[in-house]
């Protein structure tokens, strides 16, 4: 039996890596946006009618009472507004936007659960903005590698053992190593 073909399978992919504090928007069916997440959140937003979509990657929900010192891009509110405005500039309509959110893991034992705060912020922000979350994968103890094809809305998530994660999402090794969870999750 032949598998389902995807538009992005018809040629070489153009990979765009979205790092902490960044946001990217595209309608090109060959573009795949990628990121690796620990406690950070990536929001994948798109207008399914136009095929315009984008991804952001933020570290913290907000700056709290601290001065952000020019680091506003690290915070969720700014990152979400930047992504939404980028989509609208490309021709997406706000009333058609839908979201998929990923990340928010708890990778450091004994510390506050920044990942849960990040996930709660993203859910609250999107609800307040009237943007439906059509799928999500947040929380847990694993890092995630996320690939998003903005034109089709397809997302692939791979859980990453913390020992194999990039340095920015790695946590100290516990005395007893957790069992590896190597699940793939693909959302359409």
Curated annotation (Swiss-Prot):
It comes from the Bacteria. It catalyses: L-glutaminyl-[protein] + H2O = L-glutamyl-[protein] + NH4(+). One of its GO terms (molecular function) is protein-glutamine glutaminase activity. Keywords: Chemotaxis, Hydrolase. GO terms for biological process: chemotaxis. The keyword Hydrolase applies. The keyword GTP-binding does not apply. Its EC number is 3.5.1.44. Probably deamidates glutamine residues to glutamate on methyl-accepting chemotaxis receptors (MCPs), playing an important role in chemotaxis. Belongs to the CheD family. This is Probable chemoreceptor glutamine deamidase CheD. The lineage of its organism: Bacteria, Pseudomonadati, Pseudomonadota, Alphaproteobacteria, Caulobacterales.
């Amino acid at each position: 039996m032949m598998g389902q073909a995807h538009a992005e399978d018809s040629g070489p992919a153009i990979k765009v890596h979205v790092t902490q504090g960044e946001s990217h928007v595209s309608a090109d069916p060959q573009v795949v946006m990628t990121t690796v997440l620990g406690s950070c959140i990536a929001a994948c937003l798109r207008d399914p009618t136009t095929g315009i979509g984008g991804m952001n990657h933020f570290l913290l929900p907000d700056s709290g009472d601290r001065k952000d010192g020019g680091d506003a891009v690290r915070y969720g509110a700014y990152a979400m507004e930047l992504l939404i405005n980028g989509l609208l500039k490309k021709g997406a309509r706000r009333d058609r936007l839908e979201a998929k959110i990923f990340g928010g893991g708890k990778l450091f034992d004994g510390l506050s659960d920044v990942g849960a705060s990040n996930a709660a912020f993203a859910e609250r922000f999107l609800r307040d903005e009237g943007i439906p979350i059509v799928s999500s994968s947040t929380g847990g103890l694993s890092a995630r590698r996320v690939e998003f094809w903005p034109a089709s809305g397809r997302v692939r998530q791979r859980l990453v053992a913390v020992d194999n994660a990039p340095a920015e999402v790695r946590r100290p090794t516990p005395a007893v190593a957790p069992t590896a969870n190597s699940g793939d999750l693909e959302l359409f």
